[in-house]
Amino acid sequence: MIKRNPSQQRAIAHLSGPMMVLAGPGSGKTSVIVERTAYMINEGGISPSNILVVTFSRAAAKEMKERFLSFTGQQYTPVTFGTFHGVFYGILKQAYGFTAANILSDEEKFGILRELTLNYGGDLAEEGDFPEEIAREISVVKGNKIALEHYYSSCCPDEVFRQIYQGYREACQSRRKLDFDDMILYCYELFVQRKDILEAWQKKFQYILVDEFQDINQLQYDIVRMLAKPQNNLFIVGDDDQSIYHFRGARPEIMLNFTRDYPDAETVTLDVNYRCSGQILSAAMHVIGENKKRFSKKLSTPNQVGKAVQIREFQNPR
């Protein structure tokens, strides 16, 4: 077994209560999540069926599960590894009997949006990328629980956006279809309306681990908080310095305010970068240090030798 550094070992051995792990690239965060999951089962006596490990992409969830099975020498595990959409859709399937036929395809989604744009948007229908832009804004509104009257569109007049948004929601509901954001939204509404169902899933997922936490949006966070009650065995892993998906609705301030929401949360920084040279790490820390809304960190690397960092200037982002 690979020997872990003190910060990694502290995170792995954390059993109960909230913890925030600040983990930059090359810090071994995936290994920490995998080994902590195994530690909870083998050393903490926690039932694997009560553990939820959730991340943002199917590829990441698949890799996490495969690494856990390899680490434990198993071919199967009752631990739930999944994405937010996959886990929450599974909850909806049990509650409402949804099937794959209820999932809105991209073709259907953009067909609805193009038709609504023709009805309400006039000349906007001639802009080839408009359906993608308004789909992104609809996702932001849903994912962050923004009241429609308080959202100001950047891709069309506000009244046009509201008409298209309402028309899109009505079209999905009349067809009994869910888009990806509805999987999250409907799960939130289900838990708010049905405390008995929420309590059943709280008993199921008594220990929750969330990877890439800096990319979470408000709705996802609200559901995670509901699920984690009453024990609040919530273990979040992320890097506030890598939050780049604000345009998709990510709310990096959620991570920055985590200890406000959970005053008793422990915080661990995985402070050794095993991937970069000393030159790269020093340059990166100098640049990101200009960001004032971040957790201050002191990172080191055993890889001190490397090429000097080059600075190049280009005329455009492409």
PLM region descriptions:
Residues 126, 143-146, 231-232, 287-297:
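Proline-centered turn/helix-capping motifs that create local helix->coil transitions or kinks
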Residues 15, 76-78, 96-182, 205, ...:
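ATP-hydrolysis module of ASCE/P-loop NTPase motor domains
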Residues 1-13, 17-21, 52, 60, ...:
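Conserved helicase NTPase motor core
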Residues 25-33, 263-266, 271-318:
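Helicase P-loop NTPase motor core
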Residues 68, 115-119, 283-291:
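Conserved AAA+ ATPase "sensor/coupling" helix adjacent to the nucleotide-binding pocket
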Residues 43-48, 72-74, 200-201, 216, ...:
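Conserved catalytic network of the ASCE P-loop NTPase/AAA+ motor domain
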